[in-house]
Amino acid sequence: MGQMAIDESRCDDPRKLRDLLGKAASLASDYSLRSVVVGIAGREGDLLLPEVIDFFESMLRVDDSIFRMTRERAVLVLADVDRARAEEIVERLMNGFRERFSPAVDPEVDFGFFEVTPDEGDVSVKHVLLALFAPEDTY
């Protein structure tokens, strides 16, 4: 029961995700700046994934953010990048995690990408989460 309370306290308020997506949509519509929302999903019960998310958060730029959904899922918002650049950033972060911590087992993490562009019509939480965590949109 104590573990459950710890896990729940590490999850963010759902309003934060709505605000982060609103900020990305505003950057796109007001300034024609693309942003990429990255879904981070691990296996249920994976003890290493929270460490990966902590590492990602420690390496982010000031304009980037992480939203923790559950112990095994998070959303990363990268401002002023396109999808190709976001994929490079995620790869660099994963390599940095591996180099810094040399885990005995490589973390099993799936990433989904949603690019917020100036002409993107729907940046609602529901639409973005479906795009991020649908099995066919991960690699």
Residue ranges and their predicted role:
Residues 17-42:
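Active-site-proximal structural segments of metal-dependent nucleotidyl cyclase/transferase enzymes
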Residues 25-29, 53-81, 99-104:
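Conserved helix-loop-beta segment at the catalytic/binding core of cyclic-nucleotide signaling proteins
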Residues 87-104:
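An amphipathic, aromatic/His-enriched active-site/gating alpha helix that lines ligand/cofactor pockets
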